[in-house]
């Protein structure tokens, strides 16, 4: 019984670590735009969705859902910009869920410091400030 409890505790510790991520609320990000704070916005939406709406200055990667090796490699085009800066990195996906977490984990694995990474809470679908959205590429 003791061995089972230790195993369960170890599994829970691993699960909580892999699910941890830093989030940024839409209002906080809006204020950063207003204050013209520098940041790197990595948008993983599919190309069609990105063309319909995205945040200004976003780097289009079309990496969603960032599950496969090919999808994750699409994030590589952001690495030179990210590593050449100390700015925060905001990951934007359709809903701020698994695709964003997959991207977050991939960027971590590529040496991006966790304290720089943020996921837009609720993704572009939850972004309430439509006046800050851009259309087209």
Model-based region annotation:
Residues 4-15:
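Sec-dependent N-terminal signal peptides
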Residues 16-27, 35, 39, 51-88, ...:
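Rhodanese-like catalytic fold shared by cysteine-dependent sulfurtransferases
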Residues 44-49:
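Short, polar loop motifs at secondary-structure junctions
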């Amino acid at each position: 019984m003791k061995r089972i409890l230790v195993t369960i505790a170890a599994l829970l510790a691993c699960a909580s670590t892999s699910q941890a991520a830093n989030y940024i609320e839409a209002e906080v990000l809006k204020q950063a735009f207003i204050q013209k704070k520098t940041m790197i916005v990595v948008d993983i939406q599919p190309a069609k969705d990105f063309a319909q709406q995205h945040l200004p200055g976003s780097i289009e990667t079309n990496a969603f859902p960032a599950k496969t090796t090919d999808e994750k490699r699409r994030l590589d085009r952001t690495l030179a910009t990210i590593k050449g800066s100390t700015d925060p990195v905001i990951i934007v996906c359709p809903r701020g869920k698994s695709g964003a977490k997959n991207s977050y984990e991939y960027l971590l694995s590529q040496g991006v410091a966790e304290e720089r990474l943020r996921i837009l809470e609720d993704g572009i679908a939850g972004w309430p400030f439509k006046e800050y959205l851009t259309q087209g590429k």
